[in-house]
């Protein structure tokens, strides 16, 4: 019984790691990255609201970067549809 519980816990942790990623947050309305200048609090709120665990404003790209968010919440160059 104890082995089964341990296997289930390990499997759950692996699934959490596989489903999360790091990247720029996606504005689903425009298809663009969520922009920022210096507001880490705003980016962190967007990131946590999207299922990530920490977000910050990446100043050189002027966009919110999120760690641990689902891939569906992140901007990807391959699927870019931003018209801004």
Swiss-Prot record:
Gene3D superfamilies in alphabetical order: Knottin, scorpion toxin-like
Covalent S-S links between cysteines: 32-82, 36-57, 43-64, 47-66
SMART domains for the chain: Knot1
Signal peptide, first to last residue: 1-20
Protein's organism: Mesobuthus eupeus
Pfam family, one: Toxin_3
Family matches, as CDD domains: neurotoxins_LC_scorpion
Top-level taxon of the source organism: Eukaryota
Keyword Disulfide bond attributed: yes
PROSITE patterns: LCN_CSAB
LCN-type CS-alpha/beta domain span: 21-83
One GO biological process term: defense response to bacterium
Tissue expression as described in the entry: Expressed by the venom gland.
Family in the record: Belongs to the long (4 C-C) scorpion toxin superfamily. Sodium channel inhibitor family.
Alphabetized UniProt keyword annotations: Antibiotic, Antimicrobial, Disulfide bond, Secreted, Signal
Record protein name field: Antimicrobial peptide MeuNaTxbeta-2
Recorded GO MF terms: sodium channel inhibitor activity; toxin activity
GO annotation, cellular component aspect: extracellular region
Entry function: Antimicrobial peptide with activity against both Gram-positive and -negative bacteria.
Compartment annotation: Secreted
């Amino acid at each position: 019984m104890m082995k089964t519980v341990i296997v289930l816990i390990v499997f759950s942790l692996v699934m959490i790691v596989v489903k999360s990623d790091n990247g720029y947050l996606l504005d689903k309305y425009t298809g663009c990255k969520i922009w920022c200048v210096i507001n880490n609090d705003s980016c962190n709120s967007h990131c946590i609201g999207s299922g990530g665990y920490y977000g910050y404003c990446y100043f050189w790209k002027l966009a919110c970067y999120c760690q641990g968010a689902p891939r569906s919440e992140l901007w990807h160059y391959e699927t870019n549809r931003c018209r801004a």
